[in-house]
Amino acid sequence: MQMLPTPLPRTGSALVASVPATAGARRVTLKLTMRYEMQCGWPGAGPLVVSLPAAMRVVPHSITRAAVSLDGKPPATVSVTGRVIVFTLPPRRGVTCMEIGPGALTVVFAPAAGIGNPAKAGTYRIAVRIGAHSFTARLTV
């Protein structure tokens, strides 16, 4: 009996945490981690789009590259339209392998990004998209 390879389903998960995690907190550190299949640990060409819920604040209405890290490095560009934040990822460098496997992309918004928690305690959805991958993370404050 011949065993044929079974393609893996496109799956992924996203987690989010805010420090402090209290309702109404201003200028929080917001950490998003997306886990999905990557080629050689590379998250993909992007763009990375993060859509914050209407209850969250982004003040000022722009975010500097220094106020955000993607896996510990600044994004190539950051743009903000309302509560939608779009990142261009730095270009991939070096040799590309052909291995597809589980990986993680972590986005950290520093307090300087000006993101504030919702005023009311509850659970809020943050939508994230990169390439063909879409995620929903739930922030509880």
Where are these regions (language model features)?
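Ser/Thr/Pro/Gly-rich, low-complexity intrinsically disordered stalk/linker tracts of secreted
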Residues: 1-141
